[in-house]
Amino acid sequence: MTDLVYEQPLNEKIRSYLRLEYLNKQLGNNLNHDHQHRCFYPLFSLCELSERCDYRNEVLKDIERNLLQLGKWQELDHVDSEQIEFYIQSLAQAREQLQRPERCGSQLKQDRFLSALRQRFGMPGACCNFDLPQLHFWLAKPWEERQQDYQAWISHFDPLLTPITLLLQLTRSTAHFDNATAHAGFYQGDSAQALSLVRVKVDAAHGCYPTISGHRNRYAIHFVQFDQQRHSDRSIEFLLATCA
């Protein structure tokens, strides 16, 4: 078996970031492999989220906060100055892209092909060729052509997704995995420092998964046996990282 990593956000900002990261990974997977019409589901989910909420101001504030912190770290001894400089330059470039006036993904609303598909994709079984002949035609194109189309569509979200990837990398880097034990399947922790993300790495051979709850100063982890779908009463060894 292999180690599986589970993550639980402890605030709404990180919760939103993780959702967007999840969709971004699906977009990348669809760009590299021909998944036929399934490639549109994460694209339309991203369109929906970006229309409901303008993440730009929140992300820009987060970029500024991290640039300030990175600048302080840069003055310390025994730090990886190259890595810090990489994040400073990358975040500065991402900030410049995100400050452009147009909203991410807004131009896709003018695409008649995507608009027709999006109306149907929310309906069960409504992607048949008699419902969407234009989709049937597009799927018959060579993969290389469809790949170029898909790349052009998802590039509209790069100004948003690029800084979120960087910000989550920095968040995860604030803590290393340490050994921990859940006695009778339960573990509880607290922190004087405000936390934003709890990460649990556990061997799938244990046959269980964690359910994590909490807020920025306290969290609890319950392990559930998958086969029985009930709380485990065994001691579970796992790795824990609590990120600020």
From Swiss-Prot:
The gene is zapD. Cell division factor that enhances FtsZ-ring assembly. Directly interacts with FtsZ and promotes bundling of FtsZ protofilaments, with a reduction in FtsZ GTPase activity. Keywords: Cell cycle, Cell division, Cytoplasm, Septation. It comes from the Bacteria. This is Cell division protein ZapD. GO terms for cellular component: cell division site; cytoplasm. GO terms for biological process: division septum assembly; FtsZ-dependent cytokinesis. Interacts with FtsZ. It holds the Pfam family ZapD. Its main location: cytoplasm. InterPro entries: ZapD, ZapD_C, ZapD_sf. It is found in: Cytoplasm. Belongs to the ZapD family.
